[in-house]
Each structure stands twice: as C-alpha cells, then as structure tokens.
C-alpha cells in the first residue's frame, strides 16, 4: 500500500473513533462509526488476496448491519424523547437495540462469528488494529449510556462470550484465531461489570489493550502465525519466544501476572453487589481460556518438534527490528500485579 494512502486511512480511522469518543450527539456518533468502518476496510485488504478480501467483506457486512440497527434505535429514541442527546435514553426498546448494535460491533456472543474469521484472514498488523483500536468506540458509547443498559441482557451475553471464547480456542493451532477468541472472552468480562462499575471496565480495557498489543508485536517480530512456527522460533530468538509464552499466560489470567488483575477486581466487585453465582460461573469458564494457553505453552516450551535441520540459525526467517516500545509493553502486561493496591487511590 502507498504510504501516503496508508497515512490518510490511518488519520480517518483515528478521526472516526475520536468523533465517537467526544460526541454527545447521536448523529455525530453514527457518522464517526461510518468514517471508521469505511477507512479500515482498505487497511484490512492491505495484503491483496482472496482471503483478505473475504475477511474485509465479512467485516463490512457485519458492521453495516450493526450501524443500521444503531440508526434504527437512534430514530426510535428520537421519536420518544425528541432529543439527540446520548445520555437521554428513555425508551427500553431503543436501549436494547443500541446494546445489540454495539455488542455486534464488539464481537460479543452471539454475534461473535465474524471475529475469528476476519482476524484469521488479515495480516498481524491489521489484526492488532481490529482487536484493540476498533474496540474503543463501541465501549466508550456503552460507558456513556451504562445507566440505561439492560443488566440481565448484558450478563447473558457476557457469560456466552466467556464460554465461547474458551471453547472456541480449544482446538485452534492458528495464533490469530486464538487471539480472536481471547478477545471475545475479554469483552465478556468487560461487559459483565459495565452496569455495576464502568470505571472497572475501563481499567480492564486498558490492560487488555496492553497485553494484546504486546502479544501481536512479539508475533510480528518473529513472523509467527501458528503454533508450529512458534515452536520453531526457539533457534532464532529464545528470549523473545519466552516472552511470548509469558504474555500468553498473562492473557489467560494466570496469577501473579497482570492479566489476573481485572478478573480479580471484577469478581470482587460482583461479590460486593451480592452476585455470587455469576462470578462463580465466570471463574469456572475462565479456566477454559487458561487451559488452552497452558496447553499452548506446554507444547511450545516443553516439547520439541522433530526436525531434520541441525543448524541453530533460523536462516529462513526474516530479520526484524525490536521496537523501542516492546520492552515496556511486555513489562506492563506481565509484571504489574504488585501495583494493584495503588488502584485504591483512584477510588
């Protein structure tokens, strides 16, 4: 892709998300979503091949459907309230439709089917944008209208997302699909706490973005897309491969790594609100995620694939530069659990 075109598209993507973040008018919010969607489709098709075209088409159809439902909900809300203000949500039908539209954009269950397919069909860099930056706008809108949301609907979608995010990743060997199912599960955790403590959802989002960005940068450094190619990177960069495995365990929520912090705090907050059964089920379902991360770590770190090449230098891999931000990102996404008591200063 031409660098100038990529800069223009990136600026449009950021502008669309920024409009959603700062807008208090429903039409401007919808316009920001459309700007963002139309600009990211060429980015998804950056590697011009049938797979990326199919992924971009699936993404477009899903997002266009969600935008249509969102506009319908906005019109219904306008008919009942007579206002375009985001915080003025008086109609339960409009609130439910907006929730469905935004969860479809996020890729929560039962609207999750597009996430693994689209992520697998695009490049690692496009997948990083898809699973991090593209979550900001819908979640910011949910954050603004959390008082009007249907708690029971969100809880049902949250449990489904955590369950499908765990089950879906069990038989996967493609790392991009594993990251996609991980994203579905993490979104489920964020939505579960949205109506109780939206600030905790924001903290969960920040930690999720840090961990996912670290993981994708490490995979980009090694040009790794499958478990087989991951196991073959020991010859090239054993330290980086170790960091990949630690980051995977952090994504799974294994203590004492950073990924355990949001799960711990969400379970604590739900318990404070006299909800015992829900966090219990969520904790059990989270073990599915942790299981396939542990299995991936075991198969990569503790077993050796048969090879006919005794050469220790992996000459077939491209050499890539270590990004300056990689080290602090990895440290933040794995080692910040001891700093958790400092979060009490924010409350």
From Swiss-Prot:
Compartments reported by the entry: Mitochondrion inner membrane
CC per GO annotation: mitochondrial inner membrane
Gene Ontology terms, MF aspect: NADH dehydrogenase (ubiquinone) activity
Listed EC numbers: 7.1.1.2
Transmembrane annotation, as ranges: 3-23, 25-45, 59-79, 96-116, 127-147, 149-169, 178-198, 201-221, 239-259, 274-294, 322-342
Catalytic function, reaction form: a ubiquinone + NADH + 5 H(+)(in) = a ubiquinol + NAD(+) + 4 H(+)(out)
Membrane topology: Multi-pass membrane protein
Keywords: Electron transport, Membrane, Mitochondrion, Mitochondrion inner membrane, NAD, Respiratory chain, Translocase, Transmembrane, Transmembrane helix, Transport, Ubiquinone
GO terms under biological process: mitochondrial electron transport, NADH to ubiquinone; mitochondrial respiratory chain complex I assembly
Pfam families hit by this protein: NADH_dehy_S2_C, Proton_antipo_M
Highest taxon of the lineage: Eukaryota
Function field: Core subunit of the mitochondrial membrane respiratory chain NADH dehydrogenase (Complex I) which catalyzes electron transfer from NADH through the respiratory chain, using ubiquinone as an electron acceptor. Essential for the catalytic activity and assembly of complex I.
Subunit structure: Core subunit of respiratory chain NADH dehydrogenase (Complex I) which is composed of 45 different subunits. Interacts with TMEM242.
PANTHER family in alphabetical order: NADH-UBIQUINONE OXIDOREDUCTASE CHAIN 2 (PTHR46552:SF1)
Family: Belongs to the complex I subunit 2 family.
Protein name, as recorded: NADH-ubiquinone oxidoreductase chain 2
